[in-house]
Amino acid sequence: MAAYLLAVAILFCIQGWPSGTVQGQAMPFMEVFERSVCQTREMLVSILDEHPDEVAHLFRPSCVTVLRCGGCCTDESLMCTATGKRSVGREIMRVDPRKETSKIQVMQFTEHTKCECRPRSGRVNSGKRKRNPEEGGAESQVPLGLTSF
C-alpha cells in the first residue's frame, strides 16, 4: 500500500495535480483566461425559478443543470449574452403533496447554445456605491453589472 501511495505522489509531482496545477502553485495565466471568457457553461437553475407557475408541486431534484452563458468580456461596457438558445428536456419527479402522489415527467428548460459579448442595454441601479474623486470623496451610484466580475 505504501508503494502505491508513493507511486501516486510521484505521478502527481510529474504530471501535476488533477486541477492542472502542481499543488501549492498558481494556475497558469492562459488556463485562468480560458476558463473566464464568455462561453456556455454548465449551471444549476432552480425549477421553480424557471417554472414559477408550478408552486403547488414539489420537485426532485429541486434544480437541474443546463448550459448558460457566463464569463467575462474584455470591456466592462460589454456583457456576456446568449445569442443562441434551444429547449431541452429533463426528467424530474413531480410530487403533489395534497394527493400524496408522485410521477416522473419531462420538463422543458432553456439552454444557451452560443454566447457573445454585447453592449449592455439599460442601466439598473444595484445600490452599490463607488467613490467619486471629483466630488471630494463622496460616493456615487454604480449601475448593476458595471463592477468588476
Swiss-Prot record:
Tissue: Expressed by the venom gland.
Gene3D superfamilies: Cystine-knot cytokines
Keywords of this entry: Disulfide bond, Growth factor, Pyrrolidone carboxylic acid, Secreted, Signal, Toxin
Cleavable signal peptide: 1-24
Region feature (Disordered): 118-149
Biological process annotations from GO: induction of positive chemotaxis; positive regulation of angiogenesis; positive regulation of endothelial cell proliferation; positive regulation of mast cell chemotaxis; response to hypoxia; sprouting angiogenesis; vascular endothelial growth factor receptor signaling pathway; vascular endothelial growth factor signaling pathway
Location relative to the cell: Secreted
Pfam families from the UniProt entry: PDGF (PF00341)
A single Gene Ontology CC term: membrane
Chief subcellular location: secreted
GO molecular function terms attached to this record: chemoattractant activity; growth factor activity; toxin activity; vascular endothelial growth factor receptor binding
Disulfide bonds: 38-80, 69-115, 73-117
Pyrrolidone carboxylic acid modified-residue sites: 25
Statement: the UniProt record of this protein carries the keyword Signal: yes
Family affiliation: Belongs to the PDGF/VEGF growth factor family. Snake venom VEGF subfamily.
Subunit structure, interactors included: Homodimer; disulfide-linked. Interacts with VEGF receptor-1 (FLT1) with a high affinity, whereas it binds to VEGF receptor-2 (KDR) with a low affinity. Does not bind VEGF receptor-3 (FLT4).
Protein purpose: Snake venom VEGFs that may contribute to venom dispersion and prey subjugation by inducing vascular permeability and hypotension. This protein induces an increase in capillary permeability after intradermal injection, as well as a drastic hypotensive effect after intravenous injection. The hypotension is mediated by nitric oxide (NO), which is produced by VEGF-activated endothelium NO synthase. Also induces angiogenesis in vitro. Like other crotalid VEGFs, this protein interacts with VEGF receptor-1 (FLT1) with a high affinity, whereas it binds to VEGF receptor-2 (KDR) with a low affinity.
Protein's UniProt name: Snake venom vascular endothelial growth factor toxin 1
Organism: Sistrurus catenatus edwardsii (Desert massasauga)
